[in-house]
Amino acid sequence: MSRYYDFFCPVKLLAGEQALEQLASELASLGACRPLLLTDKGVNATGLATLLANVLAEGELPVAAIWDEIPADSSTAVVERIAKRYRELDCDSLVALGGGSVIDTAKAVNILTSMGGDHLLDYSGAGCLTRPLKPLAVVPTTAGTGSEVTLVAVIKDEASGRKVPFTSPFLLPQLAVLDPRLTQGLPLNITAATAMDAMTHAIEAFIGTAKNPVSDALALMAVEKIASALPQIIHDPQNKQLRLQLAEGSTLAGMAFSNSMVGLVHALGHSLGARCHLPHGLCMNLFLPTVLDYNRPEVDSELARLLLPLVGAERFAATPAHQRAEATITAIRTLRDTLWQAVKLPRTMSEAGVSDRSLLTEIRDLAINDGALLFNRKDANREQLLTLLERAWA
């Protein structure tokens, strides 16, 4: 751990049942009068966008419009079209209702509508934003990305096909709403994948080189909430308390990794997802125990501490101290087996349908250049990365 650290997360959380009903007054207190509601067609079809628009109208903050033309892999062209419409409607704020793509799109739209200009790429990279942006409220409909409390947005450049990062503390939303009604209808396979994404955020934040006491506390609580709620929600998907626990776990993990970063699981997962077009949470689930085992013994003390939030006090106390690191990895494998049996969340690349073994070298070559490797406690060269990929194959 670094001798110096800083921690920053100014996002105000509105959490619990009826949290949605608090949003209008909170947004109005930020000076919002005419918000544009951004979502995607899938979320809009569930009626959640209409529900949110009605709640805002009842709070005397009607939306100017609902824009649902946001694809799963949003682009600069999409952002620039929305920014143009925002200006035409004379909007002054944004509400993002959806998952990671919708939230990242809203952050990017907020760049253009606050900073000016028509070309999003003018603001790419880090440190290009020079002042606070207009009010942005994020209402997640999945519990996994933690994007509601991160200072990053990733948008595809349509011209080159590459994914472009935008990084600034000014990208953080002012408000985030965690209301269990918003995730009750989430299919169980997506619930499981996004929860394992959040679990990986928390664990990698806790074992990485940039960890600090504040992010540690958040990460441990995130692991506890996710490990407790996820196996139960498979059998009780409408349970509001369990849905809220997963949402809280995702947000806590987002706060942790936004300040402490992620590691090798993400480096491999980013690369597999990009090459084989697999969902991010699925990729995290594939690699998590394999990478934790690789990182031993450098992270054994952290792995031992993770056993308590993963399995509870009784099993933790019954496990000899020298066996706790291994028991943590076993507990994660057991959770993955449970999810495979319940919703067929793949544990290996072959279960995920990756049939061409020659792709492993391509995935390795992408992973070796991923920035997340910088925060992993144990270095990995090309040969070691290929070995890890082969272990995750079957």
Regions of interest found by a model, annotated:
Residues 1-93:
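ATP/NTP phosphate-donor binding region
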Residues 77-181:
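Glycine/threonine-rich beta-strand-loop-alpha-helix active-site module
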Residues 210-218, 233-245, 260-265, 318-322, ...:
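Flexible, glycine/charged-enriched surface loops at secondary-structure junctions
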Residues 144, 251-284, 370-374:
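Glycine-rich phosphate/pyrophosphate-binding beta-alpha loops
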